[in-house]
Amino acid sequence: MTAILERRESESLWGRFCNWITSTENRLYIGWFGVLMIPTLLTATSVFIIAFIAAPPVDIDGIREPVSGSLLYGNNIISGAIIPTSAAIGLHFYPIWEAASVDEWLYNGGPYELIVLHFLLGVACYMGREWELSFRLGMRPWIAVAYSAPVAAATAVFLIYPIGQGSFSDGMPLGISGTFNFMIVFQAEHNILMHPFHMLGVAGVFGSSLFSAMHGSLVTSSLIRETTENESANEGYRFGQEEETYNIVAAHGYFGRLIFQYASFNNSRSLHFFLAAWPVVGIWFTALGISTMAFNLNGFNFNQSVVDSQGRVINTWADIINRANLGMEVMHERNAHNFPLDLAAMEAPSVNG
């Protein structure tokens, strides 16, 4: 009888825990995805802060030339970064217990792999938590779908690209100048500016900025005034009010006359779907482009293929970009190799005389 009562009490505790985890009455919704999200993001954040402040230099290229990234080793907020895991480790799973000592783990850039893997797991769980909360509230799942765009982008640069290139040392450093270095090297090695998916991503980001500004300014300019001239128009809004807060007919008419009639939405729902879908699809394409270039399916490289009727080369901006890429690649990892791969693969010119 005692054993039966204890089991029932245990089940009751588990049931109360389940109800608390999945309750939508909590100030912050936890959910089953949150059970995994909270420890992974806390771990990633804690290790990032500690490593950014005090991590020793990392032998990123595997040639015994460690690179400093922390504040205590001479960097500032702009130049500091979490240096990626050493090329000597490659794609190996490298937890602390796989190293001979903590010093070795730090020297080989173990914190980077720890942070990145916990971060990716955490943001994926955050996306799942968004879906879970939407489901329990009876909402549609599009919030989680929209969030999948930055999750896909982060996964592309932190996981897919290193897998394609064969080493976590090719991942994006976790810092401001390190991010810029990653972008420059990526352009040099993959010609991303000439990749159609990157172009779609640029259209998504810049286009969504334009559309967001246009929508916000149109709504703000066509508010239904509920206050006097001496009060802010914003004071006329009550949270949860059933009435429209702005005149969509006026906004539609203004924009239709400014450009042309069918450039303006007359359906608020389709308008907001468009505002959400445009940047999400653009960033999806960018993430897909990074993932394809990870396996060296690179951007267009015309290689002086534009010629006139006589076969003479017509120089284009694409050729200028190619020359810039070679210059950037020469400067990249200059102590790890003598020549960029594009130059080293060519035959040596013949010398007469």
Swiss-Prot record:
Binding site for pheophytin a: 126
Record's protein name: Photosystem II protein D1
HAMAP family attached to this UniProt entry: PSII_PsbA_D1 (MF_01379)
Organism: Vigna unguiculata
E.C. number: 1.10.3.9
Annotated residues for binding of [CaMn4O5] cluster: 170, 189, 332-333, 342, 344
Gene transcribed to yield this protein: psbA
InterPro entries found in the cross-reference section: D1/D2, Photo_II_D1/D2_sf, Photo_RC_L/M, Photo_RC_L/M_CS, PSII_D1
Recorded catalytic activity of this chain's protein: 2 a plastoquinone + 4 hnu + 2 H2O = 2 a plastoquinol + O2
Family the UniProt entry places it in: Belongs to the reaction center PufL/M/PsbA/D family.
Lineage per the UniProt record: Eukaryota, Viridiplantae, Streptophyta, Embryophyta, Tracheophyta
Enzyme class, spelled out: oxidoreductase
Function: Photosystem II (PSII) is a light-driven water:plastoquinone oxidoreductase that uses light energy to abstract electrons from H(2)O, generating O(2) and a proton gradient subsequently used for ATP formation. It consists of a core antenna complex that captures photons, and an electron transfer chain that converts photonic excitation into a charge separation. The D1/D2 (PsbA/PsbD) reaction center heterodimer binds P680, the primary electron donor of PSII as well as several subsequent electron acceptors.
